[in-house]
Amino acid sequence: MSQFDKLLQQIKNLDRNMRFDELRKVLEHYGYSMSGPASGSSHKTFRKPGKYPITIPQHEPIKRVYVEMVKEIVESEEENE
C-alpha cells in the first residue's frame, strides 16, 4: 500500500490526527489548487473548476469537520473515475 493510499484510508476512517499538509496533498492530487491571502490569515482555500471551493484552517490537528469535507470530495472523485 502506497503512502497516498494510506492517506486516503486515514481520511475514510476520519482520523483525528490528520495534518494540514496531508489534506493538501490529497486535494492537490484531485486537481484542487490552494490559494490564500498574502498575509494575515491561517485559512487556505482550495479551488477546482466546476466544484465548490473548500476552506481549511492551517491548524493542527485538523478538526474532524474538515476531514469529513475532504472525505466527501474523495468519495465524489472516486465515483467519477
Question: Model-found features: residue ranges?
Answer:
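Basic helix-extension-helix modules of the SAP/HeH family
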Residues: D5-K6, S41, Y52-T55, I73-E78
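Polyanion-binding surface elements
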Residues: I11-G31
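Generic anion/oxyanion-binding catalytic loop in active/binding sites
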Residues: K12, I56-H59
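C-terminal structural segments of small proteins and small subunits
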Residues: H59-E81
